[in-house]
Amino acid sequence: MKKYILIIFALFSFSATNAEIRWKLSEDGTLTISGTDMPDYTAKIENGKVCVSAPWYSQKNKIKKIVIEDGVTSIGDWAFPECKNLTSITIPNSVTSIGDMAFSDCSGLTSITIPNSVTSIGEGAFAGCI
């Protein structure tokens, strides 16, 4: 019985932690990112589809809002591509850089404020967002 409860919990809890970043996707579609320095992620083509190494990528169609909490200092390469239902992003003053292709093809994006603390925006960071 205990094993089944753990399996069910794992299936319904879309959150994870690594040494630098913690994330949680709530039922309302808000992806909250906390921690410090976000790593760069990679993208590759598998069976004709783009696959991204960001841990929340498999949930990309559920993401409607991204809240990056204070303390996160960078947004990594390929962090949030193809989040078609994403409409708003909150970036704190602690962020100084946005990586390559970070928000590419987020075609539903309507609201983002980039703070003055951001001194570097990578190539294609917002490609396909309009």
Functional labels for PLM-detected ranges:
Residues 4-13:
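Sec-dependent N-terminal signal peptides
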Residues 20-30:
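The feature captures the LRR N-terminal capping module
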Residues 15-19:
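Sec/Tat signal peptide C-region and signal peptidase I cleavage site
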Residues 28-38, 61-74, 84-97, 107-120, ...:
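Structural signature of tandem-repeat unit edges
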Residues 40-59:
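Acidic/polar low-complexity surface segments
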Residues 76-79, 99-102, 122-125:
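Consensus positions within tandem repeat domains that build extended binding/scaffold surfaces
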